[in-house]
Amino acid sequence: MIKPVGVTIGDPAGVGPELIDRAFGLVKTGPVRLYGPRHVVEDIAARHPSVEPIGTSDDPIVIGQYSKASGVASVSALAKGAADLASGAIRSLMTGPISKLALADMDFPGQTEYVASVCGVSRFAMMLAGPTLKVTLATTHVAIKDLAGQLTENMVYDAGELTAQFLGSKKARIAVLGLNPHAGDGGRFGDEEAKIIEPAVLRLKAAGYDAVGPLPADTAFFRAVSGDFDAVVAMYHDQGLGPLKLVHFFDAVNITLGLPRIRVSPDHGPAFDLAGTGKANPKSTVEALKMASIG
């Protein structure tokens, strides 16, 4: 019997529940386990026969308003979904959008890092993927002031290798960006390119991967969307996600590379201001659910 797809509701006060509800009506998923507050998941499951509700909390929630209760509820759902992914009880996991405030007490900067930890994986990367542009981050949620001190050669190498493995070919064309303006301009604007990024690119090439770089970020994305590259490795969050969301604001998905099974999420937050208005766009949730269903 086919294992179910796991879906966490995200923050129940945000747009996650309504978008997931709509996506279930648009995607053939097979069996699904839906994790979240009991009254929320049971309500959604009543409209979708293939969905099994897994109640993980019971506190009342106010739609459109973040609260401690909604944050705790989102983490409870995530914890159960991640545990089932790690154990193999589900074949894949789609996580709904949560507020980073909810993870603060758990000492994890994002769902990516939390799920990887539960799965016992230390070598992982975050990819944001749309139909024409795919971007993997060498670092995830790191303050700009800390970047130069935290970026390592292994981070860059791992991001490149995991990207090629996800794309299914050593021949995948991977553009590796520089950290500094003009990729350092020969050391005028920093030495991270020479000390960290270029050695990682050379290692990728030596391992048989089609990687180039470090490239200036201001031109590499144009080349990527023009078809020169299959994916881009960016050094930090906004370097990669700014261009990605310009091209794929509504249809990109967030994929955790390096896990034993697929974990994917919509590429947006809980959007409390849109919750309950019917104005939130479901496309990213639909695309994420499609990928989870393939897994």
Mark where each language-model region is.
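Ligand-binding beta-strand-loop-alpha-helix segment within the catalytic cores
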Residues: L128-D158
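Methionine-biased hydrophobic packing positions in alpha-helices, especially
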Residues: M126-M127, M291
